[in-house]
């Protein structure tokens, strides 16, 4: 369960849009507002700062339990996550300690926050670094690689959401004595409950190790 401020980009999950909200104010007050406001956002010719923020009239989305399903996109494969070369141009062996870094798309620790949910899809980039000591013969090089087993999945999620709060509208001339009016979300939206859906490209990387290759002459 979570609670966050509603945004205009969330309205599609409620079968609504900024035009839906503007039309509701037009029906209620008999004239079309210049702009509308939702929390810290405005739309059309809105008053700045948005009146919902200025007058403390928030609108929230309450999220329920997330339903998650996954689909395998590929069988587990050995992948090289990163590599570095230790080079010795001298005439005697040297021992080097250096880091090898692997950068890969990994969803193993992704967080299904509301901000990720509303975007529809996401992937998470992770970086792994390991240090290794390598002895390199004279006039040779040794390649050190970070390898791991990668399994790619597509994760589908659905999050029920309900909405409660206010929208605002500003008018170019006074309406019933005021330039600003507020309406409850129930009067502005086609519905105040829905399901946010999306996908996340998800790659599990496991059994990460560092491999030192054979020395090669320069």
UniProtKB/Swiss-Prot annotation:
It comes from the Eukaryota. CDD domains: parasporin-2-like_N-term, PFM_parasporin-2-like. GO terms for molecular function: toxin activity. Signal peptide: none annotated. The keyword Amino-acid biosynthesis does not apply. One of its GO terms (cellular component) is extracellular region. The keyword Secreted applies. It is found in: Secreted. Keywords: Secreted, Toxin. Does not induce flaccid paralysis when injected into blowfly larvae and lacks hemolytic activity. Belongs to the hydralysin family. This is Hydralysin-3. It comes from Hydra viridissima. The lineage of its organism: Eukaryota, Metazoa, Cnidaria, Hydrozoa, Hydroidolina.
């Amino acid at each position: 369960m979570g609670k966050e401020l509603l945004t205009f980009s969330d309205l599609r999950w409620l079968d609504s849009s900024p035009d839906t909200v503007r039309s509701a104010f037009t029906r209620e007050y008999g004239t079309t507002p210049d702009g509308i406001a939702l929390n810290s956002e405005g739309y059309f010719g809105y008053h700045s700062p948005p009146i919902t923020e200025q007058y403390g009239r928030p609108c929230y989305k309450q999220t329920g339990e997330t339903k998650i399903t996954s689909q395998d996109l590929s069988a587990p494969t050995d992948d090289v996550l990163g590599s570095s070369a230790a080079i010795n141009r001298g005439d005697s062996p040297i021992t080097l300690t250096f880091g090898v870094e692997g950068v890969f798309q990994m969803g193993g620790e992704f967080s299904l926050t509301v901000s990720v949910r509303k975007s529809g899809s996401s992937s998470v980039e992770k970086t792994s670094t390991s240090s290794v000591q390598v002895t390199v013969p004279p006039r040779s090089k040794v390649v050190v690689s970070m390898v791991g087993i990668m399994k790619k999945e597509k994760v589908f999620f659905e999050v029920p959401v309900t909405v409660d709060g206010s929208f605002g509208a500003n008018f170019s001339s006074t309406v019933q004595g005021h330039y600003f009016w507020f309406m409850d979300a129930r009067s502005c939206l086609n519905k105040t409950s829905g399901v946010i859906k999306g996908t996340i490209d998800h790659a599990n990387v496991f059994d990460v190790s560092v491999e030192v290759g054979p020395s090669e002459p320069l």
